[in-house]
C-alpha cells in the first residue's frame, strides 16, 4: 500500500510540474510579441528634439536615484511607485523612463525584478524622504571611513572601468545632477565618421554623456585610500540612455526575461594571470620576463583580494591556482540579476589594484589566449527565485524541456555569441587548441559534466542544474556576456523548438544543422551582423559600434602590436 501511495504522489507531482511548464510556455507565446518588439532606430542619441531638455534631464535624474537594490547597503528597502509611460515609437517622441519595483538578488528565494527592457530604461523613483534616508546612511559611511573621494564608475565596451573621482563634499550634488564625461571614453572608436558607423551623427561622438549613480552600489574601496566607488549608468545630456552602454543592454535583456516569468541566477568564473613587474618598462622593451610569482604558496595576495571583494559586495565562493604557473581561478557566488556582472566588473579593477600593492601585474588579456577563460555559469529560475527551471525532480543528469530549449537557443546563436565572448584575435585560439587541423570553424559542443564542451551542463550541487557557457574569455565584457546569453536563451524559449528539444525524459538534443564556431574574428563579426535575433536584442546602434570597433582593431592589428602589449595593464 505504501508503494502504491508513493507512486500516486509521484504521478501527482509530475502532473503538477507538467501543468506548470505548460502554463509557462503558454505565457511565453503570449508575451513573445511584447518582448520582441523591435526598436525604432530612426531617433537615436544625438537626434532627438532637445526642447525642454532641462525638464527632461531633471526628471531623468530623479528617476535614477535608487537604481538596482539587489545589495542595499545604505537606507532601508521600500516599495516604489510604478509609472507607466509611452514607448519610443516614433522619431518625434522622446523616450521616457518607466520605473519598476526594485530587485532583491542576494538569495535565491528573493524576488527578482530587472530594470529595463527593449523600449524603456526602467529605474526606480526615489521620493525625497527616501533619498534623504539613503544619503544619510551613505554620509555616515563616508564619515566613519573618513572618505575624501568617490569614484563614479562606468564600463566601456571592453569592460574596463572608466571613472571620475569626485571630492566627498560634492557627492550629494553629483548624485542629483550626475557627472559629465566625454562619450568617446566609453565607445573607444577614434571617430565614427572614419569607420562609417554613423555619418549623420558623427558629431555626437565628441559630446559629453552623464554618469548617474546607482546608490545601492556605493561601497568603500578596500584597495584605495579613503575612497569609495559607485557604479553608474550612462545617459546623454538630454536624459536618454546611452544605447551602447553594456550595463544598460544587460539590464534590458534581464527585464525581457522577467516579462516571460523567469529570473537568472548566475556567476562568473575567471582565469587571470599574475606577472612580476620588470624593473625597466618602456614602449620598445616592454616584457614580462620576471618569473611568475603567484602559485599555491602565495596566499596573502589572494586572501587580500578575496577579502576586498567581499567588502565591495562581491562574494567569492572559491579560488585556487590553475593549470599554469601564475594562473589563478576565482569563482563568484551565484546571484540574481545584474549583480553577477557587477561583481565581475568589480573584480577586473580590484585585482589590478591589489596586485599593484605587491608589485605584480594582473591581466585578463593574454596574447597566447590559453590562460584566460571567462565562464558564465547560469540557471533559469521562476520570477520569485524559488524554483530552478532547468531541474527535473528525478535529480539525474537531465534538463527539463525549458532547459533544453534554452540550450538550443545558445547552440543556435553560438557563432554570433562567440564574437561577443571572445572579442580579440588571441581569445579565439582557445577554440582550436584541441585540434591541429587547419579549419575555418569548429563544432559547438555540449554535454553533461564535461568540462571540454562549449556548453557544460552540471546537475550536481545544492543549486541544481546549471549551464556553463564556456565560449567566453576573461577579456570579454561581463555585461555583454550576460546580455548575449540571455538573448540567445530567450530566443530558444520563444521559438518552436519542440522537435529540437526532444522528449522530457531524454538526455539527447537533436540538431538538424549542427552549429559551428568561427575561428577567425572576421568570420565571427559576419555571423554577428547576420544574426537578426541578437541584432534586435542588443540593439542596432550597439552592433554598429561594436563591429566598427573590432574592424578597426583588425585593420590596425600589426601596427598596434606594441600598443597591444600595454593592454595587459588595463584588461
Swiss-Prot record:
Region Disordered, residue ranges: 1-129
Residue ranges of every copy of the GS beta-grasp domain listed in the record: 145-239
Compositionally biased spans, kind Polar residues: 103-129
A Pfam family of this chain: Gln-synt_C
Record InterPro entries: Gln_synt_N, Gln_synt_N_sf, Gln_synth/guanido_kin_cat_dom, Gln_synth_cat_dom
Record-annotated GS catalytic domain positions: 246-571
The protein's name: Lengsin
Gene encoding the protein: LGSN
Amino acid at each position: 500500500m505504501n508503494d502504491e501511495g508513493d507512486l500516486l504522489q509521484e504521478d501527482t507531482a509530475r502532473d503538477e510540474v507538467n501543468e506548470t511548464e505548460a502554463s509557462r510556455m503558454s505565457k511565453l507565446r503570449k508575451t513573445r510579441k511584447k518582448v520582441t518588439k523591435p526598436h525604432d532606430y530612426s531617433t537615436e542619441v544625438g537626434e532627438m528634439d532637445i526642447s525642454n531638455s532641462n525638464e527632461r534631464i531633471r526628471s531623468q535624474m530623479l528617476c535614477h536615484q535608487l537604481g538596482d537594490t539587489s545589495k542595499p547597503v545604505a537606507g532601508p528597502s521600500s516599495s516604489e511607485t510604478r509609472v507607466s509611460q509611452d514607448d519610443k515609437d516614433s522619431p518625434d517622441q522622446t523616450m521616457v523612463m518607466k520605473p519598476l519595483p526594485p530587485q532583491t538578488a542576494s538569495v535565491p528565494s528573493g524576488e527578482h525584478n530587472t530594470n529595463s527592457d527593449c523600449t524603456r530604461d526602467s529605474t526606480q523613483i526615489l521620493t525625497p524622504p527616501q533619498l534623504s534616508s539613503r544619503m544619510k546612511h551613505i554620509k555616515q559611511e563616508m564619515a566613519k571611513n573618513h572618505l575624501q573621494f568617490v569614484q563614479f564608475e562606468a564600463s566601456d565596451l571592453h569592460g574596463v572601468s572608466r571613472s571620475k573621482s569626485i571630492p566627498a563634499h560634492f557627492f550629494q550634488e553629483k548624485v542629483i545632477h550626475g557627472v559629465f564625461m566625454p562619450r568617446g571614453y566609453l565607445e573607444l572608436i577614434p571617430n565614427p565618421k572614419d569607420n562609417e558607423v554613423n555619418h549623420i551623427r558623427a558629431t555626437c561622438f565628441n559630446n559629453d554623456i552623464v554618469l548617474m549613480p546607482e546608490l545601492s552600489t556605493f561601497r568603500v574601496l578596500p584597495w584605495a585610500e579613503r575612497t569609495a566607488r559607485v557604479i553608474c549608468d550612462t545617459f546623454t545630456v538630454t536624459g536618454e540612455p546611452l544605447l551602447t552602454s553594456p550595463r544598460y543592454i544587460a539590464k534590458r535583456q534581464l527585464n525581457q526575461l522577467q516579462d516571460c516569468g523567469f529570473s537568472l541566477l548566475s556567476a562568473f568564473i575567471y582565469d587571470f594571470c599574475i606577472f612580476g613587474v620588470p624593473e625597466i618598462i618602456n614602449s620598445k622593451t616592454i616584457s614580462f620576463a620576471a618569473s611568475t610569482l603567484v602559485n599555491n604558496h602565495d596566499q596573502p595576495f589572494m586572501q587580500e583580494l578575496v577579502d576586498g571583494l567581499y567588502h565591495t559586495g562581491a562574494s567569492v565562493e572559491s579560488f585556487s591556482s590553475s593549470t599554469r604557473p601564475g594562473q589563478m581561478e576565482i569563482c563568484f557566488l551565484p546571484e540574481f540579476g545584474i549583480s553577477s556582472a557587477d561583481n565581475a566588473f568589480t573584480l577586473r579593477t580590484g585585482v589590478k589594484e591589489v596586485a599593484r600593492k605587491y608589485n605584480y601585474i594582473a591581466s585578463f588579456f593574454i596574447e597566447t589566449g590559453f590562460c584566460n577563460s571567462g565562464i558564465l555559469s547560469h540557471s533559469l529560475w521562476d520570477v520569485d527565485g524559488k524554483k530552478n527551471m532547468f531541474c527535473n525532480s528525478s535529480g539525474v543528469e537531465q534538463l527539463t524541456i525549458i532547459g533544453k530549449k534554452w540550450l538550443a537557443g545558445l547552440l543556435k546563436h553560438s557563432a554570433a555569441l562567440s564574437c561577443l565572448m571572445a572579442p580579440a584575435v588571441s581569445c579565439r585560439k582557445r577554440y582550436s587548441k584541441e585540434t591541429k587541423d587547419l579549419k575555418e570553424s569548429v563544432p559547438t559542443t555540449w554535454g553533461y559534466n564535461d568540462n571540454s564542451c562549449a556548453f557544460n551542463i552540471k546537475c550536481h550541487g545544492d543549486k541544481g542544474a546549471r549551464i556553463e557557457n564556456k565560449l567566453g574569455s576573461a577579456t570579454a565584457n561581463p555585461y555583454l556576456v550576460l546580455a548575449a546569453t540571455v538573448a540567445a536563451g530567450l530566443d530558444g524559449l520563444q521559438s518552436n523548438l519542440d522537435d529540437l528539444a526532444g522528449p522530457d525524459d531524454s538526455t539527447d538534443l537533436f540538431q538538424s544543422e549542427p552549429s559551428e564556431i568561427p575561428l577567425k574574428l572576421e568570420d565571427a563579426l559576419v555571423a554577428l551582423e547576420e544574426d537578426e535575433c541578437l541584432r534586435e536584442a542588443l540593439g542596432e546602434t550597439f552592433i554598429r559600434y561594436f563591429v566598427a570597433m573590432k574592424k578597426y582593431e583588425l585593420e590596425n592589428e600589426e601596427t598596434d602590436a606594441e600598443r597591444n602589449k600595454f593592454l595587459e595593464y588595463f584588461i
